[in-house]
Amino acid sequence: MPVSDDLLRATDPLVAGWIDRELNRQRSHLELIASENFTSAAVMAAQGSVLTNKYAEGLPSKRYYGGCEFVDAVEQIAIDRAKALFGAAHANVQPHSGAQANAAVFLALLERGDKILGMDLSHGGHLTHGSPVNQSGIYFEALHYGVDPASHRIDFDQVRELAHAHRPKLIICGYSAYPRVIDFECFREIADEVGAYLLADIAHIAGLVVAGVHPNPIPHCDVVTTTTHKTLRGPRGGLILTRDEALGKRFDKAVFPGTQGGPLEHVIAAKAVAFGEALQPEFKTYAADVVANARALAERLTARGLTLVSGGTDNHLMLVDLRSVDLTGKQADLLMSDVNITTNKNTIPFDPQSPFVTSGLRLGSPAMTTRGLGTTEFGEIGEIIANRLTQPTDARVVADCLERVASLCTRFALYPHLGRVVAPVG
């Protein structure tokens, strides 16, 4: 049942109106934010179900509330499907987000003041990997590695040097803005050399992993965390996976009662549906298309003279180094917004600009691949982006970009089952 149906419009037209506006925005824009996607109608139906009414602290068959027999069944389906997808021995599907999943892992494995080693945020890491503004950098001694200045690929010599010099308790791999394949085996070697736990945060690439178009970290890492949206195309939420049952029990306790109370069983139901979709053969095709489309976009941008961090992409995202066109990320993001393309400014390695300005623009292919666009269309998107970035003051270019974006959005409709929505003005 769509959230913006006639019942909601009649009951609360103010909220319904803003939801309708958002639906129109999603339909009329090219969504190129690498961390966003479009869930299926079935996922949204599960999340909007009566399971939202049920408290269920604990785990299936080990609850603190009565009346949990049916949510137990749903949560167990989600657990079993997650394990099957990733080849894990243990899965906890309760984390409300990827950040919550990481917080639970830290609680389970670390003591306050322990050392952790993760990628520098400005090189493509994540806030929860030891940023000083996040609890991971407040309660733990955070060390950071980066990418090689020339290749912009992970500097494993630096990772090894830092690991041996500081002996961290936990090493983190997995990123929010790294366009290349991650060598989990090399990280495992380094972790073993210094006796560290190894965490892979695959929030961005989880869908690629389960489809076999990116290496699986499960055989090499002590614990894997991810979000369930992004390339997995599920609801917003988190997930913890491990091949070690003993560690799995520690993670369960760290989630509840360690960092959360009652799980969101309606969201867990939506996770179960999304995992079921990802187990289908069609999902492998989708993930392969995500990678192919990203490469098509990267190749067209490069052909038009734009510079990409590391020279291209192996996964679903890329970073445009805007210094060659004398723009900042903040400026480029606004230029894209003016022609109905949704992106985000992003720091690049060794960025001279502040995180509020940046020198980069992050682009991703998952959402528009879900809408059905292929390599030809992503090549056209590359042309639109290049025209806008290289001719930012030309009104004719703006008009042409808007026309081409509108044509693509019309040809590849989003949520046609929701029908035509006319959002109110004002």
From Swiss-Prot:
This is Serine hydroxymethyltransferase. Its EC number is 2.1.2.1. The lineage of its organism: Bacteria, Bacillati, Cyanobacteriota, Cyanophyceae, Gloeobacterales. It is an enzyme of class 2 (transferase). PROSITE patterns: SHMT (PS00096). The keyword Cytoplasm applies. Its main location: cytoplasm. Homodimer.
